[in-house]
């Protein structure tokens, strides 16, 4: 059994990879020796639109080849309206290898980019063109947004099982992030244990290229590691983990049987990596990056307590008279030396004021 290791709570826990091998009499373990950054390959000719491989023998080879982690919480249901809302960027992946075809999941996050796992892209053995993507696939005969061929792979430099895949445009010169709206990423400022989440992807124990959603709660969260109590199977690798706002908070990688399923949590390190490599990635509440200390008043970062009067932060109730906040209209104001009604004004020659000195 091929094992991968992820540091969790200062312990190393053996984890099973979750790519599914289909239509193959034998399978080699997924290689971890692929280059971290495959060079971009120029597309000289229009590539034919990829098609989903199908047939009666399209099924997982062996359960040992995938993390088949069904937990007591097995709340899974099929998504048939795959082009609706946050489901649209969820993507079915096939990796064509000499030993067969691996199936997995991913999520579109930019004009021409998708997120999935390192162990999925490792199956390309250095040839990005071996990876095909079908956003919003409904089944093996119906993928409304067509297929796309990868052209470049960038693997996360940290421990997390995360990779960015860049795609060539299709025959109509459309990019994958133009035929579907890319997913919104969470800044994860409020993400915590016990929150409701969903993992949405293409599990290998269901009909080929059908989208399924699994519901559960976060059970552990530290650094780049996130664990949850919901069920997944092989093929779910690379699935987005959504919060209740339908924002992506992590990328599912697999699990440990009878214990948990897990994802790469998008913490600050991961977020910085994504921003550096995906120019148009969209993080929620990231519209005013230069004013992080005053999110409620983005146009007045220097005066967070008085957004309605940026020119007079010390006197929000009297924006027109910052020098006399207490009584601008008072004619008897003792601090006004030129006030003819001021009895303390020694320069006052007003005959109507008998108390004047």
Curated annotation (Swiss-Prot):
Broadest EC class assigned to this enzyme: hydrolase
Subcellular location: Secreted
One annotated GO biological process: proteolysis
GO molecular function: serine-type endopeptidase activity
Active site: 119, 161, 237
Post-translational modification: Proteolytically cleaved by aureolysin (aur). This cleavage leads to the activation of SspA.
Compositional bias per record (Low complexity), positions renumbered to this chain: 40-54, 291-357
Sequence repeats: 289-291, 292-294, 295-297, 298-300, 301-303, 304-306, 307-309, 310-312, 313-315, 316-318, 319-321, 322-324, 325-327, 328-330, 331-333, 337-339, 340-342, 343-345
Region (18 X 3 AA repeats of P-[DN]-N): 289-345
Signal sequence interval, chain numbering: 1-29
GO cellular component: extracellular region
Catalytic activity field: Preferential cleavage: Glu-|-Xaa, Asp-|-Xaa
UniProt entry keywords in alphabetical sequence: Hydrolase, Protease, Repeat, Secreted, Serine protease, Signal, Virulence, Zymogen
Enzyme Commission identifier(s): 3.4.21.19
Remarks, miscellaneous: The cascade of activation of extracellular proteases proceeds from the metalloprotease aureolysin (aur), through SspA to SspB.
Name listed for the protein in its UniProt record: Glutamyl endopeptidase
Gene behind this protein: sspA
């Amino acid at each position: 059994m091929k094992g991968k290791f992820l540091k969790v709570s200062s312990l190393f826990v053996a984890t099973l990879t979750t790519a599914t091998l289909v239509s193959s009499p034998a399978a080699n373990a997924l290689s971890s020796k692929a280059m971290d950054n495959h060079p971009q390959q120029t597309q000289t000719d229009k590539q034919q639109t990829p098609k989903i491989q199908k047939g009666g023998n399209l099924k997982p080879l062996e359960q040992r080849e995938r993390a088949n982690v069904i937990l007591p919480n097995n709340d899974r249901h099929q998504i048939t309206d795959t082009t609706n809302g946050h489901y649209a960027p969820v993507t079915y992946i096939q990796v064509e290898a000499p030993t067969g075809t691996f199936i997995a999941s991913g999520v579109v996050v930019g004009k021409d980019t998708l997120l999935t796992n390192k162990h999925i892209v490792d199956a390309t053995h250095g040839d990005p063109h071996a990876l095909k993507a079908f956003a919003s696939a409904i089944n093996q005969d119906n993928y409304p947004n067509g297929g796309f061929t990868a052209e470049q792979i960038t693997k996360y430099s940290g421990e997390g099982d995360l990779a960015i895949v860049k795609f060539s445009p299709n025959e109509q010169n459309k990019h994958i992030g133009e035929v579907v709206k890319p997913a919104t990423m969470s800044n994860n400022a409020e993400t915590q244990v016990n929150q409701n989440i969903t993992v949405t992807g293409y599990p290998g124990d269901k009909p080929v290229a059908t989208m399924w959603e699994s519901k559960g709660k976060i059970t552990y969260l530290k650094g780049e590691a996130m664990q949850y109590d919901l069920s997944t199977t092989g093929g779910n690798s690379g699935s987005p983990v959504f919060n209740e706002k339908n924002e992506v908070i992590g990328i599912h990688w697999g699990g440990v049987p009878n214990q948990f399923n897990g994802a790469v949590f998008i913490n600050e390190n991961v977020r910085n990596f994504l921003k550096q490599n995906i120019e148009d990635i969209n993080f929620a509440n990231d519209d005013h990056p230069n004013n992080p200390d005053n999110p409620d008043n983005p146009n007045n970062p220097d005066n967070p307590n008085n957004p309605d009067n940026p020119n007079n932060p010390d006197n929000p109730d009297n924006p027109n008279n910052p020098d006399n906040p207490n009584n601008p209209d008072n004619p008897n104001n003792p601090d006004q030396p030129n006030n003819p009604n001021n009895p303390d004004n020694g320069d006052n020659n007003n005959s109507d004021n008998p108390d004047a000195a």
